């Protein structure tokens, strides 16, 4: 899809009340002109912007976005969004490794250092949900996935608080209404315990830091939820509507940050 058409669609749904946008940018089209056309008339300070591209070009995308935001004179500390870099999902879905996770993650964190509210390390547990996993399997693997980011990057010398604040979880939502509510609430509690085990030190003067200077902000899980495609049928759109509505309501009641 050309950037002009994507921009027009984005502006249309923004006018209808949406406050979070997601864009997929093809690696071969990745340049400053493309980004400018794609984000024309979209105020990056007023809406959450989420981007994905080929895993080998995420650092280039981050650099282009920072340059664009600086050119537009935005306050970079206020911008919210994400860049979908997920080293493990590629192996899970395709059985292939793509580059070195630690070096790419370090470069990505450096490129987005001026964007403190941008999450750039993703846990795409949605893949498991759409493959038919049970709720406990999706939750367990997602937490292990996030812990692996923490483990490898802190071993590489990065502060635990910085790494934790850059991780975003993308969960699927099944039609098991009450258990889905429980899943999201349990995920937040368990992730907070995992992050706390790394003793994240508060990197700035913050009202929310603990009595031993631990960073409580780092323990907050950022969740995007997406309704499942695993249980949809080709033969009855009305059944699909009911299932999707049930899934969306359970995620909303559980307090996810954004939803598709």
Predicted regions: what is each one?
Residues 211, 234-237:
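Non-transmembrane, aqueous-exposed alpha-helical and coiled segments at domain scale
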Residues 149-152, 190-194:
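Short, well-ordered amphipathic alpha-helical segments that serve as non-catalytic structural scaffolds
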Residues 237-247:
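Short, hydrophobic/aliphatic alpha-helical segments
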Residues 1-176, 180, 206-209, 217, ...:
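Catalytic alpha/beta active-site cores
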Residues 193-198, 213, 222-232, 247-260:
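Structured mid-domain segments that build the active-site/substrate or prosthetic-cofactor binding neighborhood
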Residues 154-157, 195, 199:
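Structural motif corresponding to the C-terminal cap of alpha-helices
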Residues 180-192:
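Extended amphipathic alpha-helical segments enriched in small hydrophobics
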């Amino acid at each position: 899809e050309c950037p002009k058409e994507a921009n027009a669609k984005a502006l249309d749904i923004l006018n209808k009340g949406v406050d979070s946008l997601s864009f997929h940018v093809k690696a071969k089209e990745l340049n400053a002109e493309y980004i400018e056309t794609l984000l024309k008339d979209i105020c990056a300070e007023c809406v959450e912007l989420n981007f994905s591209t080929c895993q080998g070009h995420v650092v280039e995308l981050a650099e282009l976005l920072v340059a664009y935001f600086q050119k537009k004179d935005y306050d970079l500390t206020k911008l919210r969004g994400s860049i979908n870099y997920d080293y493990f999902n590629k192996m899970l879905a395709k059985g292939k490794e793509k580059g070195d996770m630690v070096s790419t993650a370090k470069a990505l964190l450096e490129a987005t250092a001026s964007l403190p509210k941008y999450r750039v390390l993703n846990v795409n547990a949605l893949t498991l949900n759409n493959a038919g996993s049970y709720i406990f399997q999706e939750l367990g693997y997602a937490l292990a996935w996030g812990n692996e980011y923490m483990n490898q990057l802190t071993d590489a010398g990065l502060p635990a608080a910085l790494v934790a604040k850059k991780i975003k979880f993308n969960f699927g939502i099944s039609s098991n209404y009450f258990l889905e509510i429980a899943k999201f609430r349990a995920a937040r509690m368990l992730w907070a315990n995992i992050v706390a085990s790394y003793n994240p030190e508060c990197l700035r003067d913050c009202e929310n830091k603990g009595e031993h200077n631990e960073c409580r902000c780092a323990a907050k899980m950022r969740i995007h939820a997406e309704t499942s495609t695993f249980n949809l049928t080709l033969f009855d759109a009305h059944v699909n509507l009911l299932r999707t509505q049930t899934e969306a309501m359970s995620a909303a009641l559980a307090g996810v940050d954004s939803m598709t």
